[in-house]
Amino acid sequence: MSDQSCIIIAIAGASASGKSLIASTIHEELCNELGCEEIGIVTEDSYYKDQTHLSFEERIKTNYDHPNSMDRDLLIQHLCDLKKGKAVDIPVYSYVEHTRTQEVTRFEPKKVIILEGILLLTDERIRQEVNMSVFVDTPLDICFIRRLQRDMEERGRSLQSVIDQYKSTVRPMFLQFIEPSKQYADIVVPRGGKNRVAINMLKVQIQHLLNNK
C-alpha cells in the first residue's frame, strides 16, 4: 500500500443499492465535524473507459456492468496520487452520450475520500489501496425498481431499454462479479442507504482510522 496521507473508504454493491445515499450522508455529516474541504466523494462511474472513438450505436452495446468497462489503471493511479497529497483531474462521464466528455473535475487531496461504485471490490489492486471496504446488500428487486426510476427520470432512458439492459447485463454481472465481491468487504450493510445504525458505525470507524493515522 502507498504511503498514506488520507483515509479511503470503498463503498460497493449493486446498482441502485443505496451506495450513493450512504456516501452522501456520511459526507454531509462529517463535513460538519471535519470541515467540507477535508472529505470528498469519488465515483467509480467517472472512470468508465473513453469511447469517443466508437459510434453511438457501438457505445450503447458496451457492457457497463463488466469490470473491463472501467479504466482501472487510471483510478488506481489517482488513488495513489491522492494518498501522496497530489491533486488529480477526474474524467466527467456522460450517461447520455455513453462516453467521457472533454471536461475534467479537479479533485484536491482530502483527509477522507469516499470511493463509491459497483465493481470496486472485484479488483485486488483497489482493495489494497483502501483502508475500509463496505458492501451495501440490498435485494435485487428493490435495486431494479430504483434503477428503473432513476434511469428514466435522470438519464433519459426508455422503459424497455432499462429492462433489456437489466436482463442482459445488470443482473448477470451482479451474480458473476459484484455479489461474489461481498466476501472482501470489512462491513456488510443491509437495508441500503437508510440503515442509520450502520452509518453511525461507519462514521465511528472513520474517526478511529483518522485518530490512528
UniProtKB/Swiss-Prot annotation:
Name the Enzyme Commission number(s) assigned to this protein.
Answer: 2.7.1.48
Q: Which residues form a coiled coil?
A: none
- Residues bound to ATP are G13, A14, S15, A16, S17, G18, K19, S20
Q: Which catalytic reaction applies to this protein?
A: uridine + ATP = UMP + ADP + H(+); cytidine + ATP = CMP + ADP + H(+)
Entry's Gene Ontology molecular function annotations: ATP binding; cytidine kinase activity; uridine kinase activity
Specify one Pfam family: PRK
* A biological-process GO annotation: CTP salvage
Identify the metabolic or biological route this protein is part of.
Pyrimidine metabolism; CTP biosynthesis via salvage pathway; CTP from cytidine: step 1/3; Pyrimidine metabolism; UMP biosynthesis via salvage pathway; UMP from uridine: step 1/1
Q: Where in the cell is it found?
A: Cytoplasm
Family membership noted in the UniProt record: Belongs to the uridine kinase family.
- What name does this protein carry? Uridine kinase
Q: Which organism is the protein's source?
A: Histophilus somni (strain 2336) (Haemophilus somnus)
